[in-house]
Amino acid sequence: MDKVKIALQYMLPKHLLSRLVGKLAAAEAGALTTAAIKWFIKQYKIDMSEAAQSEPEAYKSFNAFFTRALKPGIRPLDMDADIMVHPVDGAVSQLGPIKNGRIFQAKGHHYSSLTLLGDQAEDAKRFEGGDFATIYLAPKDYHRIHMPIKGTLSKMTYVPGELFSVNPLTARNVPGLFARNERVVAIFETELGPLAMVLVGATIVASIETVWAGTVTPPTGKQVFTWEYPTQGPDAITLDKGEEMGRFKLGSTVVMLFAKDAIATFAEGVEAEAVTRMGQAFANLKDVKQAD
């Protein structure tokens, strides 16, 4: 059965399907929208008591429901200056060192950090010898993405690609999955060096949004697009630890890359398949003064 599911991933018209689902998810269809939301809540056992608006009828579109806000304080933020926090609700797929520009995906599968970053060689060099973490957001999860540490945006890259599903099954079976799918790469400058937040698209993921650019929708094609941003002055975009930086419409995966020596150790319990909750401790940081 798994082989059949993987074969279907290669055969499906994934971009066409995603565009169709995107239009349906954005539609404001009244009772039909509410019925779809209620079905989704039941199917995926979503705890709506955490949502700022707990009633399905409050959402005019499925996208509005899927990108719902949480109640204030429902995800307490670890404010320890030596702690990096989880950026999302989800589950750790893999994490570990970046060795010779290679990132571990699953048993028997690695992919290139250079390819992941859209063949931006100078960017890839900045993360050599550092660490990575891949976090999968399931349909039931809260789908806003937050900053694990304070950072100032320096660059965004849109990389066109496939739209394979990014669930654990495809991660185990599709080579180079996260470096093949459509993605948005945001690079931030932090006290501990560069941080890359890679938002990976997937089948039926209608769109990827960032708080500074809105929905990232370059023209259809195979061209990589880059935007550079000032890191100083009134136009600099600085986001605090825990602040929202983006969101998925219909969910996917976040891959984070960290500079060499930025992380001392991952926090207790942070390992492959561990459940993550935004705001909780993710990693212990090297002391900034020592790093300098």
From Swiss-Prot:
InterPro entries: PS_Dcarbxylase, PSD-B, PSD_type1_pro. The modification Pyruvic acid (Ser) is found at residue 252. It is an enzyme of class 4 (lyase). The record marks 251-252 as: Cleavage (non-hydrolytic). Pfam families: PS_Dcarbxylase. Its EC number is 4.1.1.65. GO terms for cellular component: plasma membrane. Pathway: Phospholipid metabolism; phosphatidylethanolamine biosynthesis; phosphatidylethanolamine from CDP-diacylglycerol: step 2/2. The keyword Membrane applies. The active site is at residues 89, 146, 252. It is found in: Cell membrane. Its cofactor is pyruvate. It is a peripheral membrane protein. It catalyses: a 1,2-diacyl-sn-glycero-3-phospho-L-serine + H(+) = a 1,2-diacyl-sn-glycero-3-phosphoethanolamine + CO2. Is synthesized initially as an inactive proenzyme. Formation of the active enzyme involves a self-maturation process in which the active site pyruvoyl group is generated from an internal serine residue via an autocatalytic post-translational modification. Two non-identical subunits are generated from the proenzyme in this reaction, and the pyruvate is formed at the N-terminus of the alpha chain, which is derived from the carboxyl end of the proenzyme. GO terms for biological process: phosphatidylethanolamine biosynthetic process. Its main location: membrane. Keywords: Cell membrane, Decarboxylase, Lipid biosynthesis, Lipid metabolism, Lyase, Membrane, Phospholipid biosynthesis, Phospholipid metabolism, Pyruvate, Zymogen. Binds 1 pyruvoyl group covalently per subunit. One of its GO terms (molecular function) is phosphatidylserine decarboxylase activity. Heterodimer of a large membrane-associated beta subunit and a small pyruvoyl-containing alpha subunit. Belongs to the phosphatidylserine decarboxylase family. PSD-B subfamily. Prokaryotic type I sub-subfamily. Catalyzes the formation of phosphatidylethanolamine (PtdEtn) from phosphatidylserine (PtdSer). This is Phosphatidylserine decarboxylase proenzyme. The gene is psd.
